[in-house]
């Protein structure tokens, strides 16, 4: 699949427990996963409780750019007090997906 949008709705650590593996690099760094190199091209902290990362993934001569939406305001325990931030995130994701060259490309959540 040629995934170009990833949506992540959990934090890396919640209630002191690791919830996901960090598969992106910090700005200025790269990470290797086998023969794939991942670099953070851009990070935008947005006002609606999430950030948008542009991740560059390289394997040999192939380069892909992936947009990762990371909702960082989900509380450690429970649910958000309002759905407005989630709705803003969904609208932004749909907006970015509408610019995709292949409309059949799945969304990775």
Curated annotation (Swiss-Prot):
Catalytic activity: O-phospho-L-tyrosyl-[protein] + H2O = L-tyrosyl-[protein] + phosphate
Classification via Gene3D superfamilies: Protein tyrosine phosphatase superfamily (3.90.190.10)
InterPro entries: Prot-tyrosine_phosphatase-like (IPR029021), PTN12/18/22 (IPR047170), PTP_cat (IPR000242)
Keywords, comma-separated and alphabetical: Hydrolase, Protein phosphatase
GO molecular function, one term: non-membrane spanning protein tyrosine phosphatase activity
Alphabetized PROSITE patterns for the sequence: TYR_PHOSPHATASE_PTP
Class of this enzyme: hydrolase
Cited Pfam families: Y_phosphatase
Domain of life: Eukaryota
One Gene Ontology term, aspect cellular component: cytoplasm
Residues of the Tyrosine-protein phosphatase domain: 1-109
Binding residues annotated for substrate, in chain numbering: 76
Enzyme Commission number(s) from the entry: 3.1.3.48
Family: Belongs to the protein-tyrosine phosphatase family.
Extra facts: STY 3 and STY 6 may represent a double domain transmembrane protein tyrosine phosphatase.
Listed name of the protein: Tyrosine-protein phosphatase 6
Gene source species: Styela plicata
């Amino acid at each position: 699949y040629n995934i170009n949008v990833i949506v992540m709705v959990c934090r890396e650590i919640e209630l002191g427990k690791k919830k996901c593996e960090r598969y992106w690099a910090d700005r200025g760094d790269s990470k290797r996963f086998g023969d794939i190199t991942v670099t953070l091209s851009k990070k935008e902290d947005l006002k609606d409780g999430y950030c948008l990362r542009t991740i560059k993934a390289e394997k040999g001569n192939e380069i892909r750019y992936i947009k990762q939406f990371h909702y960082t305001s989900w509380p450690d325990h429970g649910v958000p007090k309002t759905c407005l931030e989630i709705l803003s995130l969904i609208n932004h994701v749909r907006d970015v997906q509408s610019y995709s060259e292949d409309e059949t490309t799945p969304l990775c959540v």
